[in-house]
Amino acid sequence: MMARSLEISIDELGPVSLQSKENIEISSMCSVFAESEVISLIAQNKEIADIAHGIHKAIAGKAMSLLKRVGLNPGYMMTGGVAKNPGVVAVLEEQLGEKLHIYEEPEIIGALGAALYGLEKIL
């Protein structure tokens, strides 16, 4: 949704955000309202890289609030498709103050865990 609003591909979103020079805040947690903010920033002629970075900061901020609920313990692993986005990964690593462990093909880790759990239950 956000990549489409910025008229770039989803694969470009992460690398583009790493070129950011201006700190932009996206305050909405709702994706529809956040998209409205993005469209407004585009109308203000803000740089695509800066907007993308703002989007990634909002995503990372939400992840950080969830992490704080369960407790921050060093040695973080990131799974899921978002782990393939270098922009989100960079912001999270900055906020955590350490490197994230990301395995090859992070988007299948949840399914792999579910399969192993299911296998354990039937054996």
Where does each model-flagged region fall?
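A short glycine/serine-rich beta->alpha loop
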Residues: 46, 99-106
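Glycine-rich phosphate-binding loops at beta-strand->alpha-helix junctions
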Residues: 67-95, 107-110
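Glycine-rich phosphate-binding/hydrolytic loop that grips phosphoryl groups
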Residues: 1-4, 103-123
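A short helix-loop
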Residues: 1-32
